[in-house]
Amino acid sequence: MQKQGPYFHKKKNFRVLNNIKRGLGGAINLGIKEALGDNVVIMMADQSDDFNDLINYNTLINQGDYDAILGSRFLRGSKVSNYPRQKLILNRFFNYFVSLIFLNKYNDYTNAFKIYKKNTLIEISPLISESFNIFLEIPLKIISRKYKYKVIPINWFGRARGTSKFKIKELGSKYLFTLIYCFIEKNLLNIKK
């Protein structure tokens, strides 16, 4: 972003924010706080998400009475390509496990690409995750607190270049912590909308 910073500063539709709290979770929290619109889309910058799905998200959340539109790469009508095999197997196992624990049929909690009403994201705060596990925390809080959401099939295309910062060995404990935290919040604290 440093190289593109001057370019984006000149554009009316872009704001460059200096994030004091490092990490992906800090960046997402800052983006939510500073978002100017009613809706917030979270997506990765690696071009793996389909922009046609973004248009569909926006239409659905604006026309329906939804707090969130949750995409799934693993529904009839979804297209997935170039997903690393080991990562895919772990993804499917973990998401199935989460579905069992939370007694919910949603099957793609860990996918980043979703759209939310900004006020809903503010209401479920604080978001405590500091890394990729924030993508698990947000939909778990949405679902556990009984917000209104819709699940739709989306497309995903593997990264064409560069390397992912997602490291399974490093993030496993963070995902487990988030899962336990959200489970306790749902079952012991009984926090609702």
Place the predicted regions along the sequence by residue:
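Acidic donor-binding segment of Leloir-type glycosyltransferases
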Residues: 1-17
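Aromatic/hydrophobic pocket-lining residues that form π-stacking "cages" and hydrophobic walls in ligand
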Residues: 4-5, 57, 138
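Short, well-ordered coil/turn elements that cap or connect secondary structure elements
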Residues: 9-12, 63, 144
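Acceptor/aglycone-binding surface of glycosyltransferases and processive sugar-polymer synthases
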Residues: 19-22, 26-34, 39-42, 51-132, ...
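Acidic metal-phosphate-binding loop of nucleotide-sugar-dependent transferases
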Residues: 47-49
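Terminal low-complexity segments of carbohydrate-biosynthetic enzymes
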Residues: 63, 177-193
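Catalytic donor-sugar/metal-binding loop of nucleotide-sugar-dependent glycosyltransferases
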Residues: 104-105, 127-130, 139-157
